[in-house]
Structures are given as C-alpha cells and as structure tokens.
C-alpha cells in the first residue's frame, strides 16, 4: 500500500515539475504577466508539498533493514526517480529566479521572445495542480516579494536534497532499471503502428500498388528507349 501511494505521489510530482518547467520557459516572453508569476509560485509550492510527502514515505522503508531485497529494490528505484525530480525542480527554480530578476514586471521591458502567444498558461498549471481553475489574487508588488520567497525556497530544496543524501545512501548508479530507457514511448508507438498495420499492408498489396508498378515499368522502358535513340542519333551525326 505504501509503495502504491508513493507511486501516485511521484506521478503527481512529475506532472507538477513538468508544468513548472513549461511555465519557467515563458518568463520574459510575450505571454509573461503577473498571472504567470502567480501560477509559477503555486506550481512550485505544490511540487514542494508533494516532495515533502514523498520523502517521508520513502525514508522509513529504505532505513528498515528488515525489508526484503525485492521490495528494497523497488523503493530504491522510486527514490532515484524522486531525487531526479528534485534536481530538476531546483534547477528550474534557479532559472526562474534569474529570468524573473532580469525581466521585472514593474519596469518597461521588451519581451525576450516574441512567440505570438498571448495570455497565460492557466490551463496547464490548473491541470498540474489538479484544480478546475486558478484564482489570481496577487497584489501589485507580488513579483518583488516572490523573488525573495523564491530565494528562500531554493535554499530549502537544496537542504532537502542534502538531508536526503545523509539519511538514505542510495547511489544512483547502483539502481538497475526494469526496462530500457524510453521503453514506454516505444511501446506506445508500436501499439499505434500495430493498430494501423493491417490497413497499411492491405494498401501495399492492393490493386492500386499493381497499377503503380506497371506504370513505373512502362516509364522505365520508354526512358531506356529514348536514351538508346539519342545514342544512335549521336553516332550517325
């Protein structure tokens, strides 16, 4: 039960981290706004809440020496995936701090990237936070105060990573994956190909392909005849 709960929380953390990464890339662009900065704050705070919950649920089993080898291996895989999410979150938070400092909202500015996209990314953030919609209630000086808060949260995430490494020693290179990298993407792609495979095979072996083959043969014969005729004319001249 604890393992399934950890998997569900880790899946939610993956979504929140991916959403935060997507939102960070729009800072300084034509879609940047105070609403975007508020969505960034809510998304990263949601990710941190999930991270705290996952850490508590993973630390206890991994420190339990009576845990079976198979169960321990599964929890170690979850731990490595969790550590990777935290590293990405910390890197994106540092990137958000740098971009937000470079492009403050209260000063006249030119968009960093004119993507042609207008409006915020409320829908993306709402899906990651598992809510229907986001309410924007930030005041005018929100971005200035948020920068200081973001600095503190970056330190907190860094301390969390260090604390995890001290309490649970799971070197990433010792954890073996159950499947090859990108296996999920390959399996979904192969499933899509197999669903249309029957149609494509029938199309290749149908009468339409035979007529195309005949036309190609006739065209090749005409081309060879034209080349031979040109050679003969050249010799006679």
Swiss-Prot record:
Tell me which stretches of the chain form a coiled coil. 29-58, 144-169
Q: Does this UniProt record's set of keywords contain Transmembrane? A: yes
Single GO cellular component term = photoreceptor disc membrane
Broad class of the protein's primary localization: membrane
Which keywords does this chain's UniProt record carry? Coiled coil, Membrane, Sensory transduction, Signal transduction inhibitor, Transmembrane, Transmembrane helix, Vision
Q: Where are the transmembrane segments?
A: 215-234
Its GO biological process annotations read: detection of light stimulus involved in visual perception; G protein-coupled receptor signaling pathway; negative regulation of signal transduction
Covalent S-S links between cysteines = none
UniProt-listed InterPro entries: RGS7BP/RGS9BP
Q: Looking at the record's lineage, which domain of life comes first?
A: Eukaryota
| Cytoplasmic topology ranges | 1-214
Instruction: Name the segments for region: SNARE-like.
Output: 153-202
The residues on the Extracellular side of the membrane are: 235-237
The protein's location, in the record's own words, is: Membrane
Q: How does it sit in the membrane?
A: Single-pass type IV membrane protein
What does the tissue specificity note say? Specifically expressed in the retina. Only present in photoreceptors (at protein level).
Whom does it interact with, and what assembly results?
Specifically interacts with isoform RGS9-1 of RGS9. Component of the RGS9-1-Gbeta5 complex composed of RGS9-1, Gbeta5 (GNB5) and RGS9BP.
The similarity annotation says: Belongs to the RGS7BP/RGS9BP family.
Q: Which PANTHER family match?
A: R-SEVEN BINDING PROTEIN (R7BP) HOMOLOG
Q: What does this protein do?
A: Regulator of G protein-coupled receptor (GPCR) signaling in phototransduction. Participates in the recovery phase of visual transduction via its interaction with RGS9-1 isoform. Acts as a membrane-anchor that mediates the targeting of RGS9-1 to the photoreceptor outer segment, where phototransduction takes place. Enhances the ability of RGS9-1 to stimulate G protein GTPase activity, allowing the visual signal to be terminated on the physiologically time scale. It also controls the proteolytic stability of RGS9-1, probably by protecting it from degradation.
* Name the record gives this protein: Regulator of G-protein signaling 9-binding protein
Which organism is this protein's natural source?
Bos taurus (Bovine)
Q: What is the lineage of its organism?
A: Eukaryota, Metazoa, Chordata, Craniata, Vertebrata
User: Quick one: which gene encodes this?
Assistant: RGS9BP
């Amino acid at each position: 039960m604890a393992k399934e709960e950890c998997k569900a929380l880790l899946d939610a953390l993956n979504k929140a981290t991916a959403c935060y990464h997507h939102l960070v890339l729009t800072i300084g662009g034509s879609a940047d706004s105070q609403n975007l900065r508020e969505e960034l704050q809510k998304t990263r705070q949601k990710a941190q809440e999930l991270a705290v919950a996952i850490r508590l649920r993973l630390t206890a089993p991994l420190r339990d020496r009576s845990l079976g080898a198979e169960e321990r291996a599964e929890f170690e895989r979850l731990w490595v995936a969790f550590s990777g999410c935290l590293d990405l979150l910390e890197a994106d938070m540092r990137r958000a701090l740098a971009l937000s400092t470079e492009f403050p909202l209260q000063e006249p500015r030119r968009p960093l990237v004119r993507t042609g996209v207008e409006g915020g990314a409320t829908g993306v953030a709402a899906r990651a936070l598992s809510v229907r919609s986001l309410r924007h209630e930030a005041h005018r000086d929100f971005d200035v105060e948020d920068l200081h808060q973001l600095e503190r949260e970056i330190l907190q995430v860094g301390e969390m990573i260090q604390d995890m490494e001290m309490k649970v020693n799971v070197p990433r290179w010792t954890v073996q994956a159950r499947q090859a990298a990108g296996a999920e993407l390959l399996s979904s792609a192969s499933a899509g190909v197999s669903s249309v495979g029957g149609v494509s095979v029938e199309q290749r072996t149908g009468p339409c392909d035979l007529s195309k083959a005949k036309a190609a043969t006739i065209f090749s014969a005409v081309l060879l005849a034209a080349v031979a005729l040109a050679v003969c004319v050249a010799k006679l001249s």
